[in-house]
Amino acid sequence: MTSFTGITAVANATNEMAMFKQAMKEVAAHPEWMSSRQIERQRWNPYSMEGGSTCAISGENFAIVASDTRMTQNDINILTRDAEKIQILNDNIILTTSGFYGDVLQLKKVLQSRLHKYRFDYRSDMSVDLCAELLSRNLYYRRFFPYYTGAILAGIDEHGKGAVFSYDPIGCIERLGYSASGAAEPMIIPFLDCQIGHVTLSEGYERPELTLDRAISLMKDSFRGAAEREISTGDKIHLVIAEAGKPVVVKFLPLRED
């Protein structure tokens, strides 16, 4: 039985034809004559990851949100040291997002327009619980070509309690006491699991109450620790504090810049 270059002769003609087709697919996918630039174009990805990290913590009557301000390219080039990843939607709702920065901006724009329409129609601001459901539906609507983001929505609910809602790119929603997203999430969450959730804290150790001052201190410590080990997190901490019955407070704190 005859054979062709690169494929071992087999007794069964059907198997030989299948192997030939597979070989043709491999040649078409990686032709020797194609330049590296052309191959790269074939593998084009509409998404990119600009690094950075975000976090949110809720308490009895407060919610705090923080992010770094660094934006990177391929974890090597620093595109800007003043990237905005937190958006104050109203006095009770704060959105923070990491991921592909184009989708970060678009998602913020979509949510802002929906809140403006709600305010126009009902003459009042949307609640954080209603906004959380709205964001989930908007993300799910784009599930076949999703926003490449890790969104966290935080604020004060209708009962005056702090609320944090965490999302995946297709809109799965969960209300938590704290959440993190972005490049440093694997470092921040274990720290908060120990200090707030007490998941990994040994028995017999003191479990202090989560006050606003302690939450702010933990937020600072988590970002400073992450900046020591994660290259795309750094420059400044953008901290937003929402308390029941009080205006939103915004602070910028220094973080390592190397």
UniProtKB/Swiss-Prot annotation:
Family matches, as PANTHER family: METALLOPROTEASE TLDD, PROTEASOME SUBUNIT BETA TYPE-1
SUBUNIT field: The 26S proteasome consists of a 20S proteasome core and two 19S regulatory subunits. The 20S proteasome core is composed of 28 subunits that are arranged in four stacked rings, resulting in a barrel-shaped structure. The two end rings are each formed by seven alpha subunits, and the two central rings are each formed by seven beta subunits. The catalytic chamber with the active sites is on the inside of the barrel.
Function: Non-catalytic component of the proteasome, a multicatalytic proteinase complex which is characterized by its ability to cleave peptides with Arg, Phe, Tyr, Leu, and Glu adjacent to the leaving group at neutral or slightly basic pH. The proteasome has an ATP-dependent proteolytic activity.
Cellular localisation: Cytoplasm; Nucleus
GO biological process: proteasome-mediated ubiquitin-dependent protein catabolic process
Primary localization class, coarse: cytoplasm
An annotated GO cellular component: nucleus
PROSITE patterns linked to this entry: PROTEASOME_BETA_1, PROTEASOME_BETA_2
SUPFAM superfamilies listed in its UniProt record: N-terminal nucleophile aminohydrolases (Ntn hydrolases)
Protein name: Proteasome subunit beta type-1
Cross-referenced InterPro entries: Ntn_hydrolases_N, Proteasome_bsu_CS, Proteasome_sua/b, Proteasome_suB-type
Top-rank lineage group of the source organism: Eukaryota
Keywords: Cytoplasm, Nucleus, Proteasome
Family, similarity comment: Belongs to the peptidase T1B family.
Family matches, as Pfam families: Proteasome
Record organism: Caenorhabditis elegans
